[in-house]
């Protein structure tokens, strides 16, 4: 099928079909090869990207800014201290002004409602660089990394360990369901996936001959896993809950024993970063031969560039 995504925003992968995600991954492969050969095509020459950050960032800022600059574009960093973002001026009005002056907007912050309003009122493509609910650009990089390792996505088993209701787990669950993969959320009952998103992903999985499930049982979750994935136990804004989370999530630490429980020496370990080594994952695993976290981090740039190419050109 012919895919045309020009003018689209990326707010959540729930808005994208399997074919559209496949299209983005194919572009990602192409731009990664270009990057390796130092090819610069200046696709975004004369364009401006506004990057709004309510939350700190390493990978997201670097990925968007370098991806846009490599193609000849100009990226502007904006913090809440730099612009009116719902204070003294409505969010709707800020979005309208931005839309008259830039070609695209990236937002990384707290409320999903904020990125949705930016998309509704700006009239230009808006990219979700992370909200409390979703992290779609991370999920695209995850898919790219998995496919690079296994040569396919269909049928790959992915186990997310720990806080399975956080934004990274949620977006990865959506991505796996869309692409025909088998996703297992493994963690305590108190931190199980959001019921509405979980049920929607199960519906999608039935359509793609995949599966989406939750369990607190490590043996059940890990048997035959191709990918073991985890994230920090206390996300940004939840630092006050860290002690409680450590107690709750300690049984779900990814360590050598957990990796061996898959029964597959080719199982890979993934983490969106930043990581608290010795907490959600041991130093031995994240620095070991099964770890793909640095490939995963690099792939943020290539998949983000692909999203911008698909929606701006």
UniProtKB/Swiss-Prot annotation:
Carbamoyl phosphate binds at residues 57-60, 108, 135-138, 272-273, 300. It is found in: Cytoplasm. Keywords: Amino-acid biosynthesis, Arginine biosynthesis, Cytoplasm, Transferase. Gene3D superfamilies: Aspartate/ornithine carbamoyltransferase (3.40.50.1370). InterPro entries: Asp/Orn_carbamoyltranf_P-bd, Asp/Orn_carbamoylTrfase, Asp/Orn_carbamoylTrfase_sf, Asp_carbamoyltransf_Asp/Orn-bd, Orn/put_carbamltrans, OTCase_ArgI. Transmembrane segments: none annotated. This is Ornithine carbamoyltransferase. It comes from Thermotoga petrophila (strain ATCC BAA-488 / DSM 13995 / JCM 10881 / RKU-1). The lineage of its organism: Bacteria, Thermotogati, Thermotogota, Thermotogae, Thermotogales. The gene is argF.
């Amino acid at each position: 099928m012919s895919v045309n995504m020009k003018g689209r925003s990326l707010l959540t992968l729930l808005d994208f079909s399997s074919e559209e995600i496949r299209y983005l991954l194919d572009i990602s492969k192409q731009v990664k090869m270009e990057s390796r050969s130092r090819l610069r095509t200046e696709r975004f020459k004369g364009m401006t990207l506004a990057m709004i950050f309510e939350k700190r960032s390493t990978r997201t800022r670097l990925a968007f800014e370098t991806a846009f600059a490599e193609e000849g574009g100009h990226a502007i960093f904006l913090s809440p201290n730099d612009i009116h973002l719902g204070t003294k001026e409505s969010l709707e009005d800020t979005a309208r002004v931005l839309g008259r002056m830039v070609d695209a907007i990236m937002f990384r912050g707290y409320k999903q409602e904020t990125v949705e309003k930016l998309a509704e009122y700006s009239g230009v493509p808006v990219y979700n660089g992370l909200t409390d609910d979703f992290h779609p650009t991370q999920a695209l990089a995850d898919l790219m990394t998995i496919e690079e390792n296994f040569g396919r996505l269909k049928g790959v088993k992915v186990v997310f360990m720990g806080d399975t209701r956080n934004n990274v787990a949620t977006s990865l669950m959506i991505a796996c369901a869309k692409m025909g993969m088998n996703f297992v959320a493994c963690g305590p009952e108190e931190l199980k996936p959001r019921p509405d998103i979980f049920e929607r992903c199960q519906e999608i999985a039935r359509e793609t001959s995949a599966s989406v499930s939750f369990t607190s049982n490590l043996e059940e979750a890990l048997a035959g896993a191709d990918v073991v994935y985890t994230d920090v136990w206390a996300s940004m804004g939840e630092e006050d809950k860290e002690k409680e989370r450590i107690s709750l999530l300690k049984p779900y630490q990814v360590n050598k024993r957990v990796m061996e429980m898959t029964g597959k020496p080719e199982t890979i370990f993934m983490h969106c970063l930043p990581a608290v080594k010795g907490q959600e994952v041991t130093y031995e695993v994240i620095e070991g031969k099964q770890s793909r976290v640095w490939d995963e981090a690099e792939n943020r740039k290539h998949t983000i560039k692909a999203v911008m190419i698909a929606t701006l050109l």
